[in-house]
Amino acid sequence: HRLAVIASFFLSLAVIASYFISVYQEMNTPKVDIVNTELPKYSPNGEKYLHDTINNTLENGFYLWRNIAEIELVTAWNKASNIPFYAVDKRGQEIKYTIYRYMTSMGLRKDANSLSQLRRGDVIRIENGETTYLKYNLFEKRLRSLIFEFQQYKQTKNPNNQTLIQRFFYWKIALKTFSKHWFFGYGTGGYKEAMSKEYKMAS
């Protein structure tokens, strides 16, 4: 019985690890698509596209930071939604980036023409903070969110706005600060100043 429990435990771990690896690989594999391979200089409305070819973050296999015509997108979005482009969505995220991620997940360029292809239901989902048009169960949604945070941290080296990574980063700073003066401490207000110095050194 004990061997069966142990075998079942390791089998479960193997299944979870295999699932994680498959999701991670899928999230890091760009699709062979014209949106990824062709980088036009201008949008159909004449705005110059932003193409960041250094940051290779993907959303559903499409590059997030390419094909961006923000000026015309602001106008188009503000006509489609009551939440302004530079405000936050209903989850407290900057809706600008929610729009970028959602449109990218659909394989669309981030311009006015592409925004016009969104249905009312898509606009509502973006307003509610959904970053992809694909629907996942709660476990996979959280897993993909954590992988995305890790990808962003790898690209930018900035732990801010990455919930789990940000916690680990500040715990690491706190432990490092504490270890330097664990016996005598820092005195009144000194700990915050020491934490701030460690943060600047680590950033």
Task: Report residues per predicted region.
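Membrane-interfacial entry segments at the cytosolic side of transmembrane helices
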Residues: R2-S12
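Membrane-interface motif at the C-terminal end of an N-terminal transmembrane signal
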Residues: I16-N28
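Alpha-helical transmembrane signal-anchor/signal-peptide segments
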Residues: E26-K41
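Extracytosolic and intramembrane catalytic regions of membrane-associated proteins
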Residues: E38-I147
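Long extracytoplasmic/lumenal interhelical loops at the membrane interface
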Residues: F85-V123, E127, K154-K180, F184-S203
